Each structure stands twice: as C-alpha cells, then as structure tokens.
Amino acid sequence: MAAAAWLQVLPVILLLLGAHPSPLSFFSAGPATVAAADRSKWHIPIPSGKNYFSFGKILFRNTTIFLKFDGEPCDLSLNITWYLKSADCYNEIYNFKAEEVELYLEKLKEKRGLSGKYQTSSKLFQNCSELFKTQTFSGDFMHRLPLLGEKQEAKENGTNLTFIGDKTAMHEPLQTWQDAPYIFIVHIGISSSKESSKENSLSNLFTMTVEVKGPYEYLTLEDYPLMIFFMVMCIVYVLFGVLWLAWSACYWRDLLRIQFWIGAVIFLGMLEKAVFYAEFQNIRYKGESVQGALILAELLSAVKRSLARTLVIIVSLGYGIVKPRLGVTLHKVVVAGALYLLFSGMEGVLRVTGAQTDLASLAFIPLAFLDTALCWWIFISLTQTMKLLKLRRNIVKLSLYRHFTNTLILAVAASIVFIIWTTMKFRIVTCQSDWRELWVDDAIWRLLFSMILFVIMVLWRPSANNQRFAFSPLSEEEEEDEQKEPMLKESFEGMKMRSTKQEPNGNSKVNKAQEDDLKWVEENVPSSVTDVALPALLDSDEERMITHFERSKME
C-alpha cells in the first residue's frame, strides 16, 4: 500500500519540481531542448531598421569573426565600430537582449557589473566603395581592456590582419583569445552632409555578412559536443535496429503486437538522431541551418515520444498480455497520444523557428501537465495490472511486469536527480561558470530515454517462448477457476477444522437412498432430446468431439 501511494504522489512531486515536462526520461527529451546548432553566418541588410547587430556564443580560442560588405556604391560616410567581449559567466550571454545593446555598451564603457575582457575598434569610411575594398587593420585595433580590476594582459600587435577570399574580400576584425562565452556587437554609424542623398540611398545601401569560423569550421564550442553526441546516438540506434531485426527474423512467427510498437519507436529514434546529426554537419560546413530539416527533426521527435507514451500506457493496462482488448479505454489512449503529439509538436516547432517564444512557453505548460497526468495514469494502471496477475498467480507475467515497473521507478529516480542537479547547476546560480557542461542538460535526457528503451527491448525481446507473454483465453479462464480454491485456503489459513461426528439417527441412510435414486435417474433418463437423437447420427469419435465443442459454445 505504501509503494502504491508513493507512485501516485510521485508525479505531483515531479510537477512541483517543474524544470522538465516529463518526469520519466523514456517519455521526454528533457527541458526546453536546444538540440539543433545555432547558425554561424548572418546576412544583414543595411540599414535594417537598426544600427546594431549582435550575437552571443560560446567560442573556441582563436576563433575568427569575419565581416564582408557587398552592395552598390554610395556617397555616405560610414563609421564601423566593433566590440568583442568575453564573459566569465554564461548568464551574461544568456540574458543579453539585442534591444538593450546601448545600455550594455554604457556598462561596458563604465566597466560596471560585467566580467571578462573586451576588444574594440572603430574605423571611418568616406564612402561605400572604400568599405567594399580589402581592409587592413593596424595593431591598435587589437587593444584588449580588462574588466573588474583585471591586470592589463593584452599587448599591442602590429601584424596586419587581412584575409582575401575567392571573390570578395573578407575583413578580419577580431579573434578570440580563450575558450569562453562571447558577445559580439557591430555598430554602423551613417553620416552625410547631403540629406537628400542620404534619404534616397537609405533604402538600398549594402549587405553585411558576418561569419564565425573556428577549429571546426562554423561549429562553436557550445555545439561541438552535441554533434559528437548525436553521432554516437545515431550509431547506437542503428545497433538497436539491427539487434531488433535479428531477433524478429529469428522468431517472426511468434511476434506480439507490442513488439511491432517497440520496433516503430526504434525506427523513429534512428530517423530523429540522423536528421539532427545531418543538421549539425550542415551548420559545420555551411554555417546556416535548414529550417525545414529542423522542423522535420522536431516533428519526428514529437511522434517518437508520443508513440513511446502510448506504448507504455497500453503495456501498463495489460493489453495483449492480460486483456485481449482495451474496449472504451482505447479511445482515452488515442486521445492522450494525439494531445501529446499536438502540444509537443507545436512547442518544438515554435522553439526552433524562434518566431513566437512566448507562444512556445505557453505550449510548454499544458505539455508538462499532460505528461504528469500520463505518468500518474501509467503507475496506477501498473499497480492494478500487477494485482490482477497476483490473483491469477501468473508468475511469468508478474515477473515481467515487476521488472518493467522497477525500470520506470529507476527512471523516475534518475530524472529527479538530474532535475535537481541541472536546477542547482544551471538555473538558480548567479554565475554559470560551468558553461562547458551545458550540452549535458540536453543530452542526458536523450541518453536516459535510450537506456530505458534498451531495457524494454530486453524485457520484450522476441524469443522461442514468446507466446508465454501473450493473452490466451483458455488459460486465463482456467486460472480464474483455479484461483478460487487457493484464495479460500489463504483466507482461512491458521484456522483449525473441527471434526464432524456421525449422527446416530437415520439421516445418513435417507441421504444414501436419495443418492442412489439420483444416480439411477442420471443413467437411465436422458437430460434432453438431443441426448437421445444425436448418438444415432454420429458416425465417429471426431464428430462427437465437434458436437460437444459446439454445444459448449451454445451454453
């Protein structure tokens, strides 16, 4: 009773912890996942309605930020200013907003409330034609200023920093000096004495291209560990698929319905990991993401998680093992799976597109409540199914469900530990200094999902004794008939049976005479007309057995 009560209260505790939409790793990819890599190449039209361009990333040491300018000649004078700042805390990068660039630059100039170091430089161009030419910056540009009282470590470097591309020159303004989170800001000041010329040309000046290249091409320090992780997970799911196909091919005659569901989850997981890995490779070599691939990956992830939840629900209900059909419960299962697919797909698509962050957060809330309700339903169904198996004394199926329940409980316990760890390490700290481990916040949930999937594969693997887990009507009816006597024995266990004495009166003789009369009636008087007519029509023992079977069905 205590264990059952704990299982019912557990989903509520997980929801109150709050950081994740799914208490079970098998159901979830974790918190608001950032599985896809961020782009490292931008094309910004100037003017774009604002004079500032900025981004925040975790970069490798010696990562170079390139600028390229293309467009039509113009008579406007342009003042290009760069700022590159490192930070000791990832919070500074995460909380940075493009709308607050001017306020951030004021803090940077006053050296207050910020950590790390920064480089800055400014160059004036008399017209656009000069801007489009290959530029060479002197050592004054690489001047590095310490923040928060740090010692002056930067030295002026008189080496020219010029990069010549294949077609158009790329200006090389800045290079990172350590592995750290960085904020890069470009300010474009437009000034001209000819107001009319300025007004005419503002609508079509030029395009600025920003590229970030490091030791792994366009892949940043934040995304490189995730690319390796998805490559490994893609290999793992391929091995899962090969193993499951081999098992299924050996025992294809005795496959259960649930084993087809497990195969579908493996296939969708393989596709999901392959699409994510392909997206990381595209970012690495091209610097830009394919939005269609991102949406496809998120939809595949939503379908996989929805199918996984549906699989666990029908297993916990005992479908195909304890019950031949779900009946009315089937509609509830379908509605639950469809709702989860809707909310998870909507949340994932809105998150990767980045168009409606507030709407994505709103979609996350019902997803968390739905996931918690499903978890509650699963554990309640498991307890009821295990009680039924105990009553029927089906040791094989009961052992299977015990292992399955223990696996889910371990998954919940691991999820609680990871929720507490990620909350204390990444969310409630004032300075996220462990930014190298940020990728774990996303990877750990996918890894835990795969581990639980592997346990389920082992528990429900196809084998020669596959049918011992299947529902069989005859055996279930026999078990229901046989369970009554053991239950009576357990109920009266410890009680003594009083011996009965034969009464001296003549009741026993009367009872014996009645039994003899009943025996003669059963032997000589037919119970129905069919007992008299059918024997004359039967020609063989086989026909008698068929007739007996048909009569039993009619009764």
Swiss-Prot record:
The lineage of its organism: Eukaryota, Metazoa, Chordata, Craniata, Vertebrata. Named Elkin, from the Greek word Elko, meaning 'to pull'. One of its GO terms (biological process) is retrograde transport, endosome to Golgi. Residues 484-496 have a biased composition (Basic and acidic residues). It comes from the Eukaryota. This is Transmembrane protein 87A. InterPro entries: GOST_TM, GPR107/GPR108-like, TMEM87A/B_GOLD. Residues 1-21 form the signal peptide. Keywords: Cell membrane, Cell projection, Disulfide bond, Glycoprotein, Golgi apparatus, Membrane, Phosphoprotein, Signal, Transmembrane, Transmembrane helix.
